Amino acid sequence: MKVLVILGLVLLSVMVQGKVFERCELARTLKRLGMDGYRGISLANWMCLAKWESDYNTRATNYNPGDQSTDYGIFQINSHYWCNNGRTPGAVNACHISCNALLQDDITQAVACAKRVVRDPQGIRAWVAWKAHCQNRDVSQYVQGCGV
């Protein structure tokens, strides 16, 4: 019985943690999903963004008490503007998506929403972490050795 409880806890922790991509695995996935050069944004910049926003973790969330919104997933897409979590006051849901969809191991929907974000005038500058850690920097290290 004790073994079953421990096994259950291990499986639950794996389910809660979600998928944490290896760097090159994510680079290949983003390239396959059309992110390299999308709206003039290099794959290395997308990788830098994902590193600093979520550390490549699909289940990352971050609550923002100021506007009562939450950032979701590998790109930390915000519930005030881009997705619907059913809790954020005045949410826009410009991606027309449930925020929970941004937490899936399959990042296809997260990529589609990130593409929607960068179509707005701010572009990739909508992400604070990108401005702080990636903008005007050599970001080639994020794809180095990945063959992409």
From Swiss-Prot:
Record's GO cellular component terms: extracellular region
Signal peptide range: 1-18
InterPro entries: Glyco_hydro_22, Glyco_hydro_22_CS, Glyco_hydro_22_lys, Lysozyme-like_dom_sf
Pfam family, any one: Lys
One of the GO BP terms on file: killing of cells of another organism
GO MF: lysozyme activity
Keywords, in A-Z order: Antimicrobial, Bacteriolytic enzyme, Disulfide bond, Glycosidase, Hydrolase, Secreted, Signal
Enzyme class: hydrolase
Superkingdom in the source lineage: Eukaryota
UniProt-annotated catalytic positions: 53, 71
EC nos: 3.2.1.17
Glycosyltransferase listed as a keyword: no
Reaction it catalyzes: Hydrolysis of (1->4)-beta-linkages between N-acetylmuramic acid and N-acetyl-D-glucosamine residues in a peptidoglycan and between N-acetyl-D-glucosamine residues in chitodextrins
Cystine pairs: 24-146, 48-134, 83-99, 95-113
Cell location: Secreted
Positions of the C-type lysozyme domain: 19-148
Function: Lysozymes have primarily a bacteriolytic function; those in tissues and body fluids are associated with the monocyte-macrophage system and enhance the activity of immunoagents.
Further remark: Lysozyme C is capable of both hydrolysis and transglycosylation; it also shows a slight esterase activity. It acts rapidly on both peptide-substituted and unsubstituted peptidoglycan, and slowly on chitin oligosaccharides.
Assembly and binders: Monomer.
Family: Belongs to the glycosyl hydrolase 22 family.
Official protein name in the record: Lysozyme C
Organism from which the protein derives: Saimiri sciureus
